[in-house]
Design a protein with these regions (language model features):
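Surface-exposed loop/turn elements that mediate protein-protein interactions on large endomembrane-trafficking
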Residues: 38-46, 77-104, 137-158, 188-210, ...
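Residue-level signature of beta-propeller blades and closely related beta-rich strand-turn architectures
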Residues: 67-68, 132-134, 182, 237-239, ...
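C-terminal motif of bacterial Sec signal peptides marking the signal peptidase cleavage site
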Residues: 14-17
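Repeated scaffold domains used in trafficking and secretory/extracellular systems
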Residues: 47-57, 104-120, 161-173, 209-227, ...
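Bacterial signal peptide processing site
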Residues: 19-21
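An edge-strand/N-cap motif at the start of beta-rich repeat modules
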Residues: 27-93
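Sec-dependent signal peptide recognition
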Residues: 2-8
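Residue position within the beta-strands of beta-propeller blades
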Residues: 62-64, 72-73, 127-130, 177-179, ...
Length: 459
């Protein structure tokens, strides 16, 4: 099962598919950026107009950071730049319109000098969450690239020790909204930062989080959906033995900053096929109602998974409704354990199905399979396109986005050798696998085509 980790760890993995490691050139927060991050003493208002949920996808464009070696397959990392990918054509160009810019310094709006950069598109504007780390400190910083792609502004620098919950970011016509986990993982605070002046306002602090112990902690509230001036959040509550699990929903009203507890979605006790004993036997349980927070794609919300009947649905927690996505998926049964993962896009849904072979004691047999299905209008189509990843055997292609009838995916792999430097300055070489990205018509993908148009990078 895919588990959502705290963003401090997830940034280095595949949370939004737009993080990218860059050279370790950690800057020090300046007095100006620290002052910009200071909270307002007396917040007068909390934004205006309708909220918009942000992801890397926006209006037919997908924003992602690429190093030079991912583009040219060279043996040195080179620059790291933020690119805007046109999903219709496959054209990818730096998010910079400065005349004559060589895109080779921090003067370029598209320059990525953080260790990790996550991108959030809002029309032509781009918000950046940068994570800086070295041996001495680590911290996050919010920045914004203007709609004309000529200016880049620091909005807020986060104090070391706090973690940004990177899945679930929203804006309105005044503010950017995000939340922070304290270092002790017991408190989470929802903040608003003025996108024009960098002034911060604290909206609400949750004090009901677990203490960060156990496999499924730290607990955190994830932003699921926005509507008007309301933000809907949910946190997963789960015991360390993983037998009890629920999603607790709440709503934050930005007209007055109030919070309202909402419904609680609890997983059923399930059909126990094998009762674990903590030693030789492992639990094998088929659940009828299991819930997951969507952590990938361009839609937020909850997935409802029925491992007994093979059904997957989408829960709109804001209005407490369930919409079927598709059915007929493999089920958890004697000898097999199944898990489903749901991602939402503008053009449909992607369901991952992981099947794990289990023996009579519930332990793994090593017979594992992973399939992915694209679903729209209640009809599912298995995506059989695959790629060979050296060292990892054959893998499914990786879908990043599906909007306006087009799909952006990592559809192949390139292998090479790169140079790196140890902390003591010693140069060494190591093998490297690069994803090859391309676009394709959704209808062609569903028909089984592998005729992707590779991304065309330009300066």
């Amino acid at each position: 099962m895919k588990k959502y980790l705290a963003i401090a760890a997830a940034l280095a993995l595949t949370l939004t598919a737009c993080g990218q490691a860059a050279a370790d050139s950690t800057p020090t927060p300046t007095a100006a950026t620290e002052a910009a991050a200071a909270p307002a003493e007396q917040p007068q208002s909390i934004g205006s107009d309708a909220l918009r949920l942000l992801t890397a996808a926006a209006d037919g464009v997908y924003y992602q950071v690429f190093n030079d070696w991912e583009i040219n397959y060279t043996d040195t990392m080179g620059r790291a730049l933020i690119y805007a990918i046109d999903e219709q054509t496959g054209d990818a160009r730096p998010v910079c319109n400065l005349p004559g810019c060589a895109h080779d310094s921090a003067a370029c709006p598209a320059w990525s000098d953080g260790n990790v950069t996550l991108c959030y598109g809002d029309g032509d504007e781009v918000y950046l969450l940068l994570f800086y780390y070295n041996d001495e400190t680590s911290y996050y910083r919010w920045e914004r690239i203007s709609a004309d792609h000529t200016q880049r502004t620091v909005l807020a620098t986060i104090e070391p020790g706090q973690s940004v919950v990177g899945r679930g970011v929203a804006v309105d016509d005044v503010n950017l909204y995000y939340s922070l986990l304290d270092e002790d993982n017991r408190h989470q605070t929802l903040w608003a930062v003025d996108t024009a002046g960098g002034q911060m306002q604290r909206i609400y602090t949750w004090d009901d989080l677990a203490d960060g112990t156990g496999e499924y902690c730290p607990e955190m509230y994830m932003l699921l959906e926005v509507s008007g001036r309301q933000m809907t959040f949910a946190k997963m509550v789960q015991t360390n033995d993983a037998l009890t699990k629920a999603m607790q929903v709440c709503a934050v009203n930005l007209t007055d900053g109030s919070i309202t507890p909402r419904q609680r979605y609890e997983r059923d006790t399930g059909n126990v096929l094998v009762q674990g004993d903590g030693m030789e036997k492992r639990n094998l349980i088929s659940y009828r109602n299991d819930y997951h927070i969507l952590t990938e794609g361009s839609r937020g919300g909850l997935a409802n998974c029925n491992y007994q009947s093979g059904e997957v649905g989408f829960v709109d927690a804001a209005v407490d409704t369930l919409t079927p996505v598709a059915d007929g998926f493999p089920t958890t049964r004697d000898g097999w354990e199944c898990y489903y993962s749901l991602s939402g896009f503008a053009d449909g849904w992607l369901v991952w199905v992981d099947e794990y072979g289990r023996d009579e004691d519930g332990n793994g047999t090593g017979e594992n399979t992973t399939r992915q299905y694209f679903c729209r209008d209640g009809v599912k189509t298995e995506l059989t396109q695959q790629r060979y990843v050296p060292g990892k055997d054959v893998r499914n292609i990786r879908i990043l986005d599906a909007q306006q009838g087009r799909v952006l995916a990592a559809y192949d792999t390139k292998t090479g050798t790169v140079h790196d430097v140890d902390k003591d300055g010693t140069t060494y070489t190591q093998p490297m696998n690069w994803d090859i990205y391309g676009v394709i018509a959704l209808d062609d993908l569903l028909a089984g085509s592998t005729d992707f148009t590779p991304l065309a990078f330009s300066d």
